[in-house]
């Protein structure tokens, strides 16, 4: 009950406080800054994310939908993906530079990921389906080393052939970069113990600063 009351209090703060409303007001940014992030929804969302973490918000999720092409992917490669990739490149670059400029790059960890990869082979409808065996993730910021590539897939991007890591390993790594206690055990309302990370999960040491 105490935890529920705490979350309700946080919700009231987010809804009613002048401080919270100010964080969501992108008009407080200079036109140059807004232009640097890009005019599309993704760019402005990334800028909002920076404002939120600067204001003390611990976790921010920015969604960028529209990558699911189960059919006619050739057309998407020509007309759909190029503007999305341009917006993604601009937003991530601006966020990376802005965090560093404001001294937040060692306090904020950024994860750019999808929930799965895409099938290496084109399906009968000319598209690509969901593929859980291989995917790529970009991480930068606090607690992480720079310029490190971990793992490798085969030529078709079908399966890892070098240093495979699991989603649990990734989650464990991000928590480690943020300084969380990876051995912590939480308890459900009925007293059942739940580990913060899976017992089999291991941090990706190659990309952690320590």
Language-model-derived ranges and their functions:
Residues 1-210:
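Ligand-binding pockets and gating/stacking loops
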């Amino acid at each position: 009950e105490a935890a529920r009351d705490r979350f309700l209090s946080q919700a009231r703060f987010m809804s009613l406080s002048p401080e919270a409303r100010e964080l969501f007001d992108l008009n407080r940014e200079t036109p140059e800054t807004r232009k640097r992030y890009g005019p599309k929804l993704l760019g402005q969302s990334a800028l909002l994310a920076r404002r939120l973490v600067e204001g003390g918000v611990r976790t921010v999720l920015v969604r960028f939908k529209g990558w699911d092409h189960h059919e006619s992917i050739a057309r998407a490669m020509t007309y759909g993906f190029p503007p999305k990739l341009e917006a993604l490149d601009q937003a991530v670059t601006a966020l990376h530079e802005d965090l560093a400029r404001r001294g937040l790059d060692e306090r904020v960890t950024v994860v750019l990921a999808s929930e799965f990869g895409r099938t290496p082979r084109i399906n009968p409808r000319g598209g690509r389906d969901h593929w859980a065996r291989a995917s790529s993730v970009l991480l930068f910021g606090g607690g992480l080393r720079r310029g490190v590539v971990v793992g490798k897939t085969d030529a078709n991007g079908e399966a890892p052939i070098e240093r495979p890591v699991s989603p649990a390993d990734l989650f464990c790594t991000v928590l480690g970069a943020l300084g969380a206690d990876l051995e912590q055990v939480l308890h459900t309302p009925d007293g059942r113990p739940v580990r913060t990370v899976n017992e089999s999960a291991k941090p990706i040491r190659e990309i952690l600063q320590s």
